[in-house]
Amino acid sequence: MHLLLFQLLVLLPLGKTTRHQDGRQNQSSLSPVLLPRNQRELPTGNHEEAEEKPDLFVAVPHLVATSPAGEGQRQREKMLSRFGRFWKKPEREMHPSRDSDSEPFPPGTQSLIQPIDGMKMEKSPLREEAKKFWHHFMFRKTPASQGVILPIKSHEVHWETCRTVPFSQTITHEGCEKVVVQNNLCFGKCGSVHFPGAAQHSHTSCSHCLPAKFTTMHLPLNCTELSSVIKVVMLVEECQCKVKTEHEDGHILHAGSQDSFIPGVSA
């Protein structure tokens, strides 16, 4: 009887120690299984933090598998605090103010747009000066064409055309009031003809853009003198390319190969 009690007293502590060791082994075997599960549930538990700060440990899963839970959490917080400023959006972009709706462009883009507008403002006067120079060079070479701006396109210089161009003709006389008459001038580019043959029989004729249909108008002027002054003005209606004759009134302006006929005025 005493021997039996002695054996029971000895075996009871041994059984407790073995069960305690088995429990530790079970916990150690279950901890690797629970650890990845807790790590998988970590982003879902803190969903707002995952949206603002992306998980940097997705690209390096071996760091999470080998490190304990506490050490991995500290390392995670350290990495997020270091790189969080690159990923977190500023509050001004996440919550735009009302003033930003009224602004058409951000301040940064305005500084870039202003120099471009400045360049456009600088280029526009140059184009205007170029147009003025072109009109001065082509149509203001002689005193007869001074002050006349003609509606002629620049590409028509290279065409063989002859047409009427409307303009306002000013009739003046000394001691009289000036009168403005709406008239047409002939503008265009005509060709030349050369007939081959012997040296003494060869003939070359050049055609000019001249009036084909016109009328004359007697225009009386209001003068301070007692004698009245009447001007005869040729009003051009149609133009065509033809050879210039001596009896036709008016004068031809030569601008390179381009010819212009302005109707003359006789007293």
Curated annotation (Swiss-Prot):
Q: Where is the composition biased (Basic and acidic residues)?
A: 88-101
Disulphide bond pairs: 162-209, 176-223, 186-239, 190-241
Residues in domain CTCK? 162-246
Annotated Gene3D superfamilies: Cystine-knot cytokines
Main localization (coarse)? secreted
Q: Where does this protein reside within or beyond the cell?
A: Secreted
The keyword Disulfide bond is assigned to this record: yes
Q: Name one GO molecular function term.
A: morphogen activity
| One CC-aspect GO term | extracellular region
Residues annotated as transmembrane: none
Which GO biological-process labels does this protein carry? Answer: anterior/posterior axis specification; anterior/posterior pattern specification; bone mineralization; cell migration involved in gastrulation; cellular response to cadmium ion; determination of dorsal identity; determination of heart left/right asymmetry; gastrulation
Signal sequence bounds: 1-17
Record PTM text: N-glycosylated.
Pfam families with a match to the protein in the record = DAN
Q: Which InterPro entries match?
A: Cerberus, Cys_knot_C, Cystine-knot_cytokine, DAN
Identify the glycosylated residues: 26, 222
The family database entries (SMART domains) matched by this protein are listed as: CT (SM00041)
Top-level taxon of the source organism: Eukaryota
The reply to whether DNA-binding figures as a keyword in the UniProt entry is no
Q: Where is this region: Disordered?
A: 19-52, 87-113
What keywords are assigned to this protein?
Cytokine, Disulfide bond, Glycoprotein, Secreted, Signal
Q: How does it assemble?
A: Forms monomers and predominantly dimers.
State the family it belongs to.
Belongs to the DAN family.
Q: What the protein does? A: Cytokine that may play a role in anterior neural induction and somite formation during embryogenesis in part through a BMP-inhibitory mechanism. Can regulate Nodal signaling during gastrulation as well as the formation and patterning of the primitive streak.
What's the protein called, per UniProt? Cerberus
Origin organism of this chain? Homo sapiens (Human)
Q: What is the lineage of its organism?
A: Eukaryota, Metazoa, Chordata, Craniata, Vertebrata
Q: In the UniProt record, what gene is named as encoding this protein? A: CER1
